[in-house]
Design a protein with these regions (language model features):
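Non-heme di-metal
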Residues: 3-129
């Protein structure tokens, strides 16, 4: 399934994602989803919007609207619900909290690797243009 046509940072990210999903550990899946995605995306999108609005707001009004809407929904609804879900799933079980922490950290590391790889690929393409 994981062939050479995809860069390593993408393969690593996808492989981990599917390992988590197929683990069937609902508290781990919820933690990775919450802390590896939902909890960080609003802040990430805010930074993207700030950079997009500098020169190109008219050209990118639809994507800016998408980001702003995503920030609103994640910040006001999804984020708090996801945190509540983690609390309910892990409860007072310290082992579940440890697993949630371990897998959330790995998810964040792999997401950073994914974005770093994307930036490197983009810079390499620009340097050859």
């Amino acid at each position: 399934m994981y062939k050479r046509q995809l860069p390593k940072h993408i393969i690593d990210f996808l492989k981990f994602t599917f390992e988590v999903v197929y683990s069937n550990n609902i508290h781990v899946i919820a933690a990775v989803f919450t802390f590896g995605r939902e909890d960080l995306i609003p802040d990430m999108f805010i930074q993207i919007i700030k950079n997009l609005k500098i020169d190109t707001e008219k050209e990118l009004s639809d994507i800016i609207y998408y980001f702003e809407r995503h920030i609103e929904v994640d910040s006001d609804e999804h984020g708090p619900l996801a945190l509540e879900m983690i609390q309910q799933l892990c409860g007072n079980d310290s082992e579940k909290w440890e697993e949630a922490l371990k897998y959330s950290k790995k998810a964040l590391q792999l997401r950073i690797g994914l974005w770093d790889g994307i930036m490197t690929n983009k810079k390499n393409k620009l340097s050859f243009a």
